[in-house]
Amino acid sequence: LDQPDGHADYLQAHIPGAVYVDLDTELAQHGAAAEGRHPLPSHATLQAAARRWGVNDGDIVVAYDDAGSVAAARAWWLLRRTGVDVRVLDGGLGFWTATGRPVQSGEGVMPEGDVTLVESLVGELSIDEAAALPAHGVLLDVRVAPRYRGETEPIDPIAGHVPGAINLPAASHIAADGTMVDSAALRAAFAEAGVTEGTQVAAYCGSGINAAHTALALAEVGIEAQVYSGSWSQWSNTPGRPVAVGGTPDGDVRAG
């Protein structure tokens, strides 16, 4: 599994037996701007994709990528919430090859699977729920700090963050070798952001990809998190939503 342009890299080298997963067409779908850049795939789309990957009922699925497990985390989150036993290979392809393990080239094809996914909204946060969460829980904005502060916005129409959201970049959970930082460091970072066991917490990013990685990091330390999948790309394209700028959660709030 890789970023949308990763198929060529996959064809050159991948873990033996691995099947390529397309982030844009199988782990997301195209929609209106008001839905965000990476709307969730329909249940039918995800199930058809999982069967194409060769997933059968009862299988353990392992997802990996070569970008800090960010895209793999999206697959993990989607499959986990639909009843699949799924794991993420820590460190991905880079760690695999760095430790001398074999790779193969070419297209990997698996026999059609028969998995039946559970239809579920577990773990997903709507735009209204995201707006309300800071009043009684923690909403994490996992984008880089300049985007959170509203100093720059390279993709979406408005810069800033959801009022009340706390900034904790997803990249801070990834070590230099592409593996997840250790559990003690994760717990300390989340605790500093006000997240401990029992906290209602959700994450958002630009379009719902990096936020899934934060949900994975939270699960690593035993904390269940929701993902606001529409994320900033939906919020900033929705008229009337207030926008906060600056380095604090409530910052300078402006009308949307």
Go through each PLM region and give its residues.
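Cytosolic catalytic domains that perform sulfur/thiol-centered chemistry
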Residues: 1-256
